[in-house]
Regions:
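A residue-level signal for conserved active-site and pocket-lining positions in enzyme catalytic cores
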Residues: 3, 27, 177, 196, ...
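A short beta-turn/loop motif at secondary-structure boundaries
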Residues: 15-16, 222, 247, 273
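A generic structural signal for well-ordered coil/turn residues at beta-strand boundaries
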Residues: 173, 179, 192, 226-227, ...
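Catalytic cores of DNA base-excision repair glycosylases
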Residues: 8-192, 198-207
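The catalytic Nudix box helix
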Residues: 251-273, 277, 282
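Structured beta->alpha junctions
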Residues: 16, 117, 244-245, 259
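Conserved small/polar residues in nucleotide/adenosyl-binding loops
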Residues: 1-9, 271-276
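N-terminal strand-loop-strand
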Residues: 210-258
């Protein structure tokens, strides 16, 4: 399929050790490859292995993650690193079953680590792979459904286990599928079909369904919160507070704020006479 024709250069592919693959895959969730590269380099320099990550204080690993967002990702990385140290002697396991027991690792990440780092014949099905396979097969199933993802994983698993005896290299196959979806079989009805190695037998193209496949239900609308924020200064210092350990932006620091939009007079009155009930002091 021409698996190396459109592989992007990335630091985690130069030396696909399990730790590098793991960190990169978690960083790449909800984040573009080019945006991840400098954060990956900084993180690896500071925390080059599982042992260093497991021993890292929270404030430090949160600071290293600063700018990537979705901070639960790095909290889960730290918790999983502690698991690996305690249960596996610091060695990242090489089977999907064991990887799935680690905090924050789902079926895609487990498949990516097992196949890319250890060359195990297991699939790594992300959004790109779902799109590619759905189009090649003209499958109009809703890819947002877990049952559809699971069925695709089972089909790819069976195929890979068979084809590995015919020379299929799992790490290259999975990376090629990911790259095909990211660079050629792109979303939003604008794929580069003429560049695709599967051009001749892509059923969605042959049936003129490229614009309608894959089928994907809309995500829930974002909840919007309205708050009044207080920037309280004392010389060069600004007052901050730490958010609760659970919930939205758990454990991060924020400017003091209260629910709702207050007029200037209301805000000034609240600032000069705060009470625990209004939330400014909590």
């Amino acid at each position: 399929m021409g698996s190396e024709m459109c592989i992007r250069d990335s630091p985690w592919r130069d030396d696909p050790k399990a730790y590098k693959v793991w960190i990169s895959e978690i960083m790449l969730q909800q984040t573009r490859v080019e945006a991840v590269k400098p954060y990956f380099a900084r993180f690896m320099e500071a925390l080059p292995d599982v042992e260093a990550l497991a021993a890292c204080p929270e404030d430090r690993y949160l600071k290293l993650w600063e700018g990537l967002g979705y901070y639960n990702r790095v909290r889960n990385l730290h918790a999983a690193a502690e698991q690996i140290m305690e249960q596996y002697g610091g060695t990242i396991p090489d089977t999907v079953e064991e990887l799935l027991r680690l905090k924050g690792i789902g079926s895609y990440t487990a498949g990516a680590i097992a196949s890319i780092a250890y060359n195990r014949p297991v699939p790594a099905v992300d959004g790109n792979v779902l799109r590619v396979i759905s189009r090649v097969c003209a499958d109009d199933s809703d890819i947002m459904k877990q049952s559809v993802r699971s069925a695709m994983e089972r089909s790819l698993q069976a195929m890979m286990e068979t084809e590995v005896t015919n020379g299929l290299i799992p790490r290259k196959f999975n990376q090629a599928l990911m790259e095909l979806g990211a660079m050629v079989c792109v979303p939003n009805g604008a794929p580069h079909c003429l560049e695709c190695p599967w051009y001749g037998f892509c059923e969605a193209r042959l049936q003129d369904k490229i614009d309608t496949i894959p089928v994907k239900t809309r995500a829930k609308a974002r909840r919007i919160e309205e708050r009044t924020v207080f920037v309280i200064r004392d010389g060069e210092h600004v007052a901050l507070r730490k958010r609760p350990a659970k919930g939205l932006l758990a454990g991060l620091y924020e400017l003091l704020n209260v629910s709702g939009i207050l007029e200037q007079q209301e805000a000034c009155l609240l600032y000069t006479s705060p009470s625990p009930r209004d939330g400014l002091l909590s």
